[in-house]
Curated annotation (Swiss-Prot):
PANTHER family, A to Z: UPF0178 PROTEIN YAII
Protein's UniProt name: UPF0178 protein YaiI
Organism (species): Salmonella enteritidis PT4 (strain P125109)
NCBIfam families: PRK00124.1 (NF001095)
Pfam family, one: DUF188
Highest taxon above the source species: Bacteria
Record gene name: yaiI
CDD domains documented for this protein: PIN_YqxD-like
Family: Belongs to the UPF0178 family.
């Protein structure tokens, strides 16, 4: 099992939670980004720098993740692709995507893209709240416990 992070867009506070979790769970944590990242020294934490470009980091995560891995991303198309490979997906707000929910998310994303393309300003997501951080940490722990039961 490996935790993969779409690190270019992942909030720093979520990365901090992941650093502590990787140590506690003794699991590989790989942060994939198109820029250099500073991470704490750890035998469990590493970065994977990819070339700059549209979806380069996403494509690398899809290529390398396996069933049973966890992917941290807010990118809906990336989430859909790794779900097809049998990986679990958690967004930085603590929402776990599933085969049942990802289709609805893809539809909503496409609708919002259409609105933006027609000139409608849709705004971005709200800032990450303390409640979001707690929810993320709780869902991460829940995934870990479920993974341990499956062994």
């Amino acid at each position: 099992m490996t935790i993969w992070v779409d690190a270019d867009a992942c909030p720093n506070v979520i990365k901090e939670i992941l650093y502590r979790a990787a140590e506690r769970m003794q699991l590989p944590l790989i942060l994939v980004a198109n820029q250099a990242l500073r991470v704490p020294p750890s035998r469990f934490i590493r970065t994977l720098r990819v070339a700059a470009g549209f979806d380069v980091a996403d494509n690398e995560i899809v290529r390398q993740c396996k069933a049973g891995d966890l992917v941290i991303t807010a990118d809906i198309p990336l989430a859909a692709e790794v779900l097809e490979k049998g990986a679990a997906v958690l967004n930085p707000r603590g929402e776990r995507y599933s085969d049942a929910t990802i289709r609805e998310r893809l539809t909503m994303r496409d609708f919002m893209d259409t609105l933006r393309a027609s000139g409608v300003q849709t705004g971005g997501p709200n800032t990450l709240s303390p409640r979001d951080r707690q929810h993320f940490a709780a869902e991460l722990d829940k995934w870990w416990l479920e993974s341990q039961r499956k062994k």
